[in-house]
């Protein structure tokens, strides 16, 4: 009989003995999971690497190590035998528990991963990690682990299940923002319901804010939120939710700001399956949980309905009011994210003028900073707006369901007295129109950045149309509604006009025409017909504006005569074989001809007169990312302006109203029109 299988165990014992003078006897800590990703990258017992590893682990588990922050890094040896390691303790545990957990994990490391150069060990109270590579200040997704309760949520009502997932997802994502903006990169949150929901998120403190947030968001997406509890580990971050307090609430009380309490009033409870048995070794511990789902905030919805009814009696308008759709019940999705007005008022310094970021069609936008350091954009709807209450409800309903890097994220809302406020993530670089239409700012966006922005907008619209759980038509895509993040990443904003489509719905009609002049498709402006192809038309206009730095609403000259608006002007350049004359002079000497030409071609396909001729957003994304895809020949665009002032102006002359009444010119977002 071979005794080869005993070698790792004997090595583990001898290694543990060599560290025993450095560590006092410790309690047992339950091993949740481990990762030894490579069987190729190994070392031998007599190697320099093993000597360096012992030095590293002795340093990390030493009583002289600093456990006050719950995080420590160390390096031992020189390349190519250098070892880098770290430990991360859960943010609420004491120094003593942290020290003991690290010492315990050091003793166990060779039991779980003998001879491996790259190792991650996960325990409930701590994580130990080391590698032959530099792992400091770097996000790592290899070596992940997921632990889920074995029982699904038991409910015959799918809406209740979805509402539970929305509650957990939205609260975890809000906690992720708080953690990313804190120095400790740790945050807990307790949602007050009849049976409380507890959440915890944490990153290694050496990560940047952006890396921490991205890591946590990825971990949240990695969990199946149909279970009644679970957790997800990456070497760089972790997230967890339960219905019982699994962390030290006293130690974390300061991390949960009293200014952001959930305001939902649950009306029903969800029946849950009984929890399974807990496995202690190797398989991880399942969560024994019973979770309550917050169901619609009936009072809040009734408040909206009552308010709409009163205004309908008081105010007569020249258009037919559309009833709120069935999706209005979903405003409760964001119920757990309702903000307290006093907290928002304090964050914006009582809506101080110096904090004002801008003004939109329905109100003003302010920058706010909460005591935790989180920066937000606060959209305060005007109290005198005759239309804002509808858009407020619509925006909460729509945006609360969306999570995509190319969409501005809704953090919460406030509805107190006559105040209607939306709280968004803060996007520092203003909107796209601030750059492309300003002669002094245009040079900051070279072609590489503009091409990236075009791709980001396309992916964001594709998510709305196809990849999200809902099919959403934005209806107000324009340069002013594209915000730019830290890395000039495009984020679509302002969902006040958006409409949700049913599963098999492809188009809809409305007598309430809303939008911005120059971006609206012909069939929408004339007949109130809108579909995904309406957004495609707007996207095409946006692409032409990004390439040219010109507004579509202006009239341009060609050969000494009027060439019409930007769409018509581009079509004439294309027909004459000189489309590159459209390029913004600020980057004319530094761009890829094939990329610009292809983008102009795609834009002309998007603004074709007939909706069925326009490509879908999925096709557009493929066209942008795959140069080998052949492009169709574009047909004449909608709203085509002829060169002679005596000739008809295409579709525009069929409208029974003047274009000045059709809609505003770029700086406002709403118009009411009654077509024939």
Curated annotation (Swiss-Prot):
Residues 252-279 are annotated as: Disordered. Residues 17-287 are extracellular. GO terms for cellular component: membrane. Residues 31-135, 146-246 form the Gnk2-homologous domain. Keywords: ATP-binding, Glycoprotein, Kinase, Membrane, Nucleotide-binding, Phosphoprotein, Receptor, Repeat, Serine/threonine-protein kinase, Signal, Transferase, Transmembrane, Transmembrane helix. InterPro entries: GNK2 (IPR002902), GNK2_sf (IPR038408), Kinase-like_dom_sf (IPR011009), Prot_kinase_dom (IPR000719), Protein_kinase_ATP_BS (IPR017441), Ser-Thr/Tyr_kinase_cat_dom (IPR001245), Ser/Thr_kinase_AS (IPR008271). ATP binds at residues 357-365, 379. It is a single-pass membrane protein. It holds the Pfam family Stress-antifung. The keyword Transcription does not apply. Residues 351-631 form the Protein kinase domain. The keyword Zinc does not apply. The modification Phosphothreonine is found at residue 516. Residues 309-676 are cytoplasmic. Its main location: membrane. One of its GO terms (molecular function) is protein serine kinase activity. It comes from the Eukaryota. The active site is at 476 (proton acceptor). This is Cysteine-rich receptor-like protein kinase 4. It comes from Arabidopsis thaliana. The gene is CRK4.
